[in-house]
Amino acid sequence: MGYDDRPVLRGVDLAARRTEVVAILGANGSGKSTLIRAALGLVPLVDGQVRLFGTPLRRFREWRRIGYVPQRLGAASGVPATVREVVSSGRLARRGFLRPAGAADRLAVDAALIAVGLLDRGSDPVGTLSGGQQQRVLIARALAGEPELLVLDEPTAGVDAASQQAFAGALADFVTRGGTVLLVAHELGLLEPLVTRAVVVHLGRIVHDGPVPEPAGHHAHPEHDHVHPHAPDSSGMWQ
């Protein structure tokens, strides 16, 4: 796929399987975020096809099965709402807009808030939370919908260590319950132990698909926390 006749992704052939935690890694501008946006139908394809849970994208309607947290989107977004109200909106795809919230919805929202460590902040305005806490609210919103596939675009970018630890715990619980995670990252940080498979994108092409690449040279120094390769190696749920 591409923008204005400029190719962004070329020759991508990729599938994610149930209970995998797949990290899409690469430098800024490599095409990794575009890859997952194309997989969700958020940007059009010039050629090729996408299948979600075995169904061609154009016929897929079961969006409640997917939870998506986009890149750098504040949970407040200018709307005066509490943490619980934002997280509760994640139930709409599952219960519908016309049916009022029931006991199952409230339990799911509580479970999502507990998973990200924000149950005690449920009545607080989202705008009063830190950036990392707002990102945790967005992940809780996605979890509240009880998806089977969780798609996260740079969820830990610029957030504090406590929030990263909360993300890691929430994702570990999600996978334990049979969920699948597709994660875009520039750095994995505390999420690295959860990753079962790493896909490295370089100049719009997949150049590595396997274990998380080991850092090399000065990037392997203990004080350097990069986990992605800075040059390409030689080397389902959606595809």
Where does each model-flagged region fall?
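Conserved ABC transporter NBD signature motif
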Residues: 48-62
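Conserved ABC ATPase "signature" region
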Residues: 88, 103-121
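Conserved ABC ATPase signature
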Residues: 125-129
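Conserved catalytic motifs of ABC-family nucleotide-binding domains
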Residues: 146
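Catalytic Walker B motif of ABC-type/P-loop ATPase nucleotide-binding domains
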Residues: 150-153
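H-loop/switch region of ABC-family ATPase nucleotide-binding domains
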Residues: 185-186
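H-loop (His-switch) and adjacent beta-strand-loop-beta switch element
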Residues: 198-211
